[in-house]
């Protein structure tokens, strides 16, 4: 098997993307500059040594003359490490077919209990995690020998090995899985103790352990990539049999490529923020005097979901709906009167613009026309993507969520007593996950039929992810909503036990978190299951949104009062990764050799110097170096 890049051309518009001094002053963020990026358009094939090394490491020894089940891969540990590294550095999308082939081979070896996998703890744990996440049927019982700490010789393993066991334990999809439950308990305890006693001398490894322990299921994809790039260290895999060969692959060239890929995505996210801000202003949402302005927050969250430049429309549709849902939710809560809130629902049901005087108030006009124009625009775009009209679906989703807002408004204003089930029956919709996902999914490159969108699977995916986000949100907003007499799941849990054994707030919060965890595992079961109605590409969106909920509400309300998010926003959207001169030279230094291969007119901008050259047919990516 050979590994080859298959990258798309990402045209560079030449627009300058500048920092926002008002939000992130230059003196506080030295990496941010008001100068435009120095554009580097180069062929990734210029780093020929790197390509050769990657191909060599992925070139499994497959004997095609023998039955498939006897396929032997002598380099399975290295292959798995490469896959893990590609994923952690955010460039795995370029190698997906090769990764799939290697995991197929790994699964065959797993079924045969081959020594390549089972003789090494790190390889064993990594194989389990990668295979389970991909949907292969692998039993956690195979990790039973490591489930109890007393059965593991800690003198013979190191912290990276325990990290791999810890990550494997996080893939528990059922409450009954005692093996992974016990594995999680001792590995998390061990790693926490290592941090407390400063027993990890390697600073990068210490920070990586701390990052995993803080909020593992709240690690957003692109934030995880940024952290991995900052803490990248090939020594993480030094215990493996193939460590020497692997370390030769993971050199500065490879890291430079991953950093450039990150900076390309970051430039795209900045462009999307500008588009989002123009849309916000065009909709006059910036003139509203109430509620939360979450434009930057929505841009950050959608950027953290995916860095693929091709998915710009997905991110923008999602971000716009985060903004719209938040603005209208705030209007229903405290920005407008009951009659004005009802009016918005009536207007959406009618779906017709009216003269300004018929809206009743300027706020109602602004909110309705923002929804009306945005949905109509997205419906036209989605018609092209899907090959059919989806406007009725989009309107239906808006009627649904506004109807839930109305139910909640009536309930709390009339002081109606609710059970927890009654509350959750509407609040899982009003959290907004369903409408944001199903509308943005129209631009994912997958044809979505009515059968798919109306299926029980779709409902279950939406409900489980929404329940996670709703319950975790309730835990963090419980005190505020109790003062406002609006109530949430925590207050309802407290009320439900008044006539039984009374529970305190801490116990009620624990119950709410347990229910959120139950729904998270249910979501994982559907996402990891193969042969379902939705392709994995679609189901992954639900998992990404679940991580957003875990990120936002793990220790506070980061959505309403962002604190950690502000630091993360700087590193993801504003601060480019440094491409050190030696690394840059490794990637773009062979421009002369490249220019000799030219076949089509092209302009190569290298460190602000322009060379009019031709473009070889295999140049598929634009790299920006700051």
Curated annotation (Swiss-Prot):
UniProt enzyme class: lyase
Any Gene Ontology biological process: miltiradiene biosynthetic process
UniProt xrefs under SUPFAM superfamilies: Terpenoid cyclases/Protein prenyltransferases, Terpenoid synthases
Locus of motif DDXXD motif: 329-333
Bound cofactor: record note: Binds 3 Mg(2+) ions per subunit.
Residues where Mg(2+) 2 binds: 329, 333
Pfam families, alphabetized: Terpene_synth, Terpene_synth_C
EC number: 4.2.3.131
Cofactor(s) listed: Mg(2+)
Residues holding Mg(2+) 1: 329, 333
UniProt: Mg(2+) 3 binding residues: 473, 481
Transit peptide endpoints, chain numbering: 1-51
Disulfide bridge positions per record: none
Subcellular location: Plastid, Chloroplast
Catalyzed reactions: (+)-copalyl diphosphate = miltiradiene + diphosphate
Pathway note: Secondary metabolite biosynthesis; terpenoid biosynthesis
Source organism superkingdom: Eukaryota
GO molecular function: magnesium ion binding; miltiradiene synthase activity; terpene synthase activity
Keyword terms of this UniProt record: Chloroplast, Lyase, Magnesium, Metal-binding, Plastid, Transit peptide
Entry text on domains: The Asp-Asp-Xaa-Xaa-Asp/Glu (DDXXD/E) motif is important for the catalytic activity, presumably through binding to Mg(2+).
Record function comment: Involved in the biosynthesis of ent-kaurene diterpenoids natural products such as oridonin, miltiradiene, eriocalyxin B and nezukol, known to exhibit antitumor, anti-inflammatory and antibacterial activities. Catalyzes the conversion of (+)-copalyl diphosphate ((+)-CPP) to miltiradiene.
Other observations noted: Abietane diterpenoids (e.g. miltiradiene, abietatriene and ferruginol) accumulate specifically in the periderm of roots. The ent-kaurene diterpenoid oridonin, main constituent of Isodon rubescens, accumulates in leaves.
Protein name in UniProt: Miltiradiene synthase KSL1, chloroplastic
The organism's taxonomic lineage, starting at the top: Eukaryota, Viridiplantae, Streptophyta, Embryophyta, Tracheophyta
Gene name in the database record: KSL1
């Amino acid at each position: 098997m050979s590994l080859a890049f298959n990258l798309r051309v990402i045209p560079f518009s030449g627009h300058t993307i500048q920092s926002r001094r008002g939000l992130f002053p230059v003196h506080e963020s030295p990496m941010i500059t008001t100068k435009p990026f120095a554009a580097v358009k180069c062929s990734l094939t210029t780093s020929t040594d790197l390509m050769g090394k990657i191909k060599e490491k992925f070139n499994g020894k497959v004997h095609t003359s023998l039955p498939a089940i006897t396929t032997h891969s002598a380099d399975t540990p290295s292959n798995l490490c490469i896959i893990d590294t590609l994923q952690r550095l955010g460039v795995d999308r370029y190698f997906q077919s090769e990764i799939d082939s290697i995991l197929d081979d790994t699964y065959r070896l797993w079924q045969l209990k081959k020594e390549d996998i089972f003789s090494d703890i790190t390889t064993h744990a990594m194989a389990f995690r990668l295979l389970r996440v991909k949907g292969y049927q692998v039993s956690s019982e195979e990790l039973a020998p490591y489930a109890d700490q007393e059965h593991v010789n800690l003198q013979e393993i190191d912290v990276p090995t325990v990290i791999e066991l810890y990550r494997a334990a996080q893939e528990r999809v059922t409450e009954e899985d005692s093996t992974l439950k016990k594995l999680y308990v001792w590995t998390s305890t061990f790693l926490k103790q290592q941090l407390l006693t400063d027993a990890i001398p390697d600073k990068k490894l210490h920070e990586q352990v701390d990052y995993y322990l803080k909020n593992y299921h709240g690690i957003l994809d692109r934030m995880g990539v940024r952290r991995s790039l900052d803490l990248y260290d090939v020594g993480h895999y030094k215990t493996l049999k193939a460590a020497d060969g692997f370390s030769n692959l993971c050199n500065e060239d490879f890291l430079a490529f991953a950093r450039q890929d990150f900076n390309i995505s970051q430039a795209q996210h900045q462009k999307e923020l500008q588009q989002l801000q123009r849309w916000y202003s065009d909709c006059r949402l910036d003139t509203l005097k109430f509620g939360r302005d979450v434009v930057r927050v929505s841009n950050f969250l959608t950027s953290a979901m995916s860095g693929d430049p091709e998915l710009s429309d997905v991110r923008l549709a999602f971000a716009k709906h985060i903004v719209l849902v938040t603005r209208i939710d705030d209007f229903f809560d405290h920005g407008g009167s009951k009659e004005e809130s009802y009016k918005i629902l009536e207007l959406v049901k009618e779906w017709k613009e009216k003269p300004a005087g018929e809206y009743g108030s300027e706020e109602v006009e602004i909110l309705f026309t923002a929804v009306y124009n945005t949905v109509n625009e997205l419906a036209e775009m989605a018609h092209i993507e899907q090959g059919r009209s989806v406007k009725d679906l989009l309107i239906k989703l808006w009627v649904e969520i506004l109807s839930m807002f109305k139910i909640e408004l009536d309930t709390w204003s009339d002081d109606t007593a609710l059970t927890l089930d009654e509350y959750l029956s509407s609040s899982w919709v009003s959290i907004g996950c369903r409408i944001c996902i199903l509308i943005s999914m129209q631009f994912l490159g997958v044809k979505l039929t009515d059968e798919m969108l109306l299926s029980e699977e779709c409902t279950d995916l939406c409900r489980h992810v929404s329940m996670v986000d709703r319950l975790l949100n309730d835990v963090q907003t419980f005190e505020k909503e109790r003062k406002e007499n609006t109530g949430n799941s925590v207050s309802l849990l407290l009320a439900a036990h008044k006539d039984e054994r009374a529970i305190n707030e801490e116990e009620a919060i624990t119950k709410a978190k347990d229910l959120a965890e139950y729904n998270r595992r249910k979501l994982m079961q559907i996402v990891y299951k193969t042969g379902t109605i939705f392709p994995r590409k679609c189901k992954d969106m639900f998992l990404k949104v679940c991580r957003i909920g875990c990120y936002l509400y793990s220790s506070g309300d980061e959505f309403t009062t962002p604190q950690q998010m502000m630091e993360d926003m700087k590193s993801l959207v504003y601060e480019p990764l440094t491409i050190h001169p030696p690394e840059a030279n490794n990637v773009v230094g062979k421009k002369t050799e490249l220019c000799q291969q030219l076949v089509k007119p092209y302009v190569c901008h290298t460190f602000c110097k322009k060379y009019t050259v031709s473009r070889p047919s295999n140049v598929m990516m634009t790299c920006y170096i700051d």
